């Protein structure tokens, strides 16, 4: 059947590609700040966009999203102390962190090696004319991985214990409270979604080009539209010591 014939079928309504079947009306209204053409279904529920506490409110089936990994790791251990089941989505993130422990003898060596590598990369950026290396997106990505690895290392007895902890934290299973970077949440959805460290969305301090700026806007849109019914911003919780 030709596509033009489909609209002759009774009760068939033409929808634009920007119409979302997933999100409640208030969530769509919020997302329109970043994607103005987005529209909700006429029969969508109103839904809720509000502030709240991820530590006190998050339950099984909820998503918790962040622009970077490090805050999610700290949240994972918060939930562990509260005896709440949680995982960080992305087994390949865990494998990448485990790869960073290859040929390392002990935790002290691990810390020294990766702090030196991070500093060396910073110096190379300076040598190549980058005025503020901390605001370079590649540096920020490496720094996030190093800080994540070293945080888990501080809670580990030795390198083998560190690897086991990493394997238990990062998973592709969908169970408990699902902690995820926005990148890893693409294509997923939940009735309720928390966003932590909303100051990192969009991550404007690392922007060097218009293309990067647009990618950050796209990520912010992705984060918002993972929520079907309720979107909760936690503006108070922070991973900063």
Which positions does each model-derived feature cover?
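The feature marks helicase ATPase cores and/or their adjacent C-terminal helical subdomains
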Residues: 1-241
């Amino acid at each position: 059947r030709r596509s033009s014939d489909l609209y002759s079928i009774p009760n068939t309504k033409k929808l634009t590609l920007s119409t979302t079947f997933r999100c409640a009306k208030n969530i769509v209204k919020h997302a329109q700040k970043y994607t103005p053409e987005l529209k909700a279904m006429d029969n969508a529920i109103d839904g809720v966009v509000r502030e709240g506490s991820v530590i006190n409110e998050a339950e099984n089936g909820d998503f918790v999203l962040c622009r970077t990994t490090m805050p999610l790791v700290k949240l994972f251990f918060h939930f562990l102390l509260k005896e709440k089941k949680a995982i960080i989505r992305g087994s390949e993130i865990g494998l990448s962190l485990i790869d960073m422990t290859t040929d390392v003898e002990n935790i002290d060596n691990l810390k020294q090696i990766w702090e030196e590598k991070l500093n060396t990369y910073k110096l190379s950026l300076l040598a190549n004319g980058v005025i503020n290396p901390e605001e370079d997106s590649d540096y920020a990505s490496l720094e996030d991985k190093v800080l994540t690895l070293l945080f888990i290392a501080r809670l580990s007895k030795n390198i083998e214990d560190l690897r086991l902890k990493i394997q238990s934290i990062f998973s592709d299973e969908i169970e408990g409270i699902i902690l995820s970077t926005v990148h890893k949440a693409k294509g997923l959805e939940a009735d309720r979604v928390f966003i932590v460290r909303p100051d990192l969305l969009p991550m404007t301090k690392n922007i060097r080009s218009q293309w990067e700026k647009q990618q950050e806007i796209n990520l912010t849109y992705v984060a918002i539209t993972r929520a079907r019914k309720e979107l909760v911003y936690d503006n108070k919780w922070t991973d900063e010591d």
